[in-house]
Amino acid sequence: MANTAQALKRIRQTNKARAQNASQRSTIRTVMKKFLKAIEAKDIATAEQEFSTAASLLDRAAQKHIIHKNKASRLKSRMHAKKKALVA
């Protein structure tokens, strides 16, 4: 257990940040699942909309160091390839 006021404060800050980061990661996963469902249903309009939302969330998460920038780029690339295959 933390003994100093500084250590107690750092624990509070870490727990708060962990909760916020987990929430954002969960939101990203949810939007990506919606995108994949739209792809499976061959719904181009919904897929376009969900791709845009997911790409935006991924970029923001990478910018805030919630996920690595290369991971965000890789996920966007894979989603774009699936969207392109659906349209073609």
Swiss-Prot record:
Record-linked Pfam families: Ribosomal_S20p
Quick check: keyword RNA-binding in the entry? yes
Function, please?
Answer: Binds directly to 16S ribosomal RNA.
GO molecular-function annotation terms?
small ribosomal subunit rRNA binding; structural constituent of ribosome
Protein species of origin: Dichelobacter nodosus (strain VCS1703A)
Q: Where is the composition biased (Polar residues)?
A: 16-25
**InterPro entries in the record, alphabetically?**
Ribosomal_bS20 (IPR002583), Ribosomal_bS20_sf (IPR036510)
What does the UniProt keyword field contain?
Ribonucleoprotein, Ribosomal protein, RNA-binding, rRNA-binding
Superkingdom, natural source: Bacteria
Q: What is this protein called?
A: Small ribosomal subunit protein bS20
Give yes or no: UniProt keyword Secreted.
no
What are the GO cellular component annotations?
cytosol; small ribosomal subunit
